[in-house]
Amino acid sequence: ELRQGFADFYKNNFNVELNSNNEILPLMGSKEGIMHISLAFLNEGDEVLIPNPGYPTYASVTELVQAKAVYYNLKEENDWQPDFEALEKTDLSKVKLIWVSYPHMPTGANATLELNQKLIDFGKKHNILIVNDNPYSFVLNENPLSIFQIEGSKDIALELNSLSKTFNMAGWRVGMVSGNAILIDAILKVKSNMDSGMFYGIQKGAIAALKLGKDWFESQNEIYTKRRNLIFELAEKMNC
């Protein structure tokens, strides 16, 4: 039922079709998915492309599984997007996975369909798994995107999502990872040795949240916009 809730959410909000039986794996928060994915697909000595700046957990988990973090720089003049020309000049022979996160943390930069297409093309060319960490897609964002809106993306990509930011449910620890059945099965083999499932009451709450419509997102973003404007005013008064 929760898997179907996620599938309906993706269809309604991204126009993306996900098979609820084998292309969605609920998580106890998407953060654990970073560990599960790393354990499932990385071996000692493998390399991982990690954004700089970016979420610190990507690097710490990479080190935990004895893989090597290789940082790629995101710069304001490039709209905080990867420099694919620079990446192509990098030795990618040991790279197995690249972490991307848009809307980007900490800059807030948004993805575009063009960027997502470049990511998928890059992954396919070099046989690198693309993992899109997508928890902020509805926060101050008029055009939420999923990596799976790109044709053929399921061949080479996974996507993490979370109810923590979208529905203010951080303490509930509800997230998901989606992708093709083979990739999801590999992650499930790791996760099934970590826990025995999610409390049913939490699942029911998550299912109800996933059914909320645009009014919810609009009301939340109205609050966030007011808060952001206050921060801007404060920063200006402090000459920051």
Task: Kindly give the residue locations of the regions a language model identified.
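PLP-dependent aminotransferase class I/II
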Residues: 156-236, 240
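A short helix-loop-beta submotif of the ANL/AMP-binding
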Residues: 63-70
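Active-site phosphate-binding strand-loop segment of PLP-dependent enzymes
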Residues: 70, 74-142
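Short acidic capping loops at alpha-helix termini that bridge into adjacent secondary structure
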Residues: 17-24, 44-47, 94, 154-157
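N-terminal small-domain helix-loop-helix segment of the aminotransferase-like
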Residues: 1-29, 36, 210-212, 230
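Helix C-cap/helix->beta junction micro-motif
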Residues: 65, 125-126, 238
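Conserved PLP-anchoring active-site segment centered on the Schiff-base-forming lysine
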Residues: 40-62
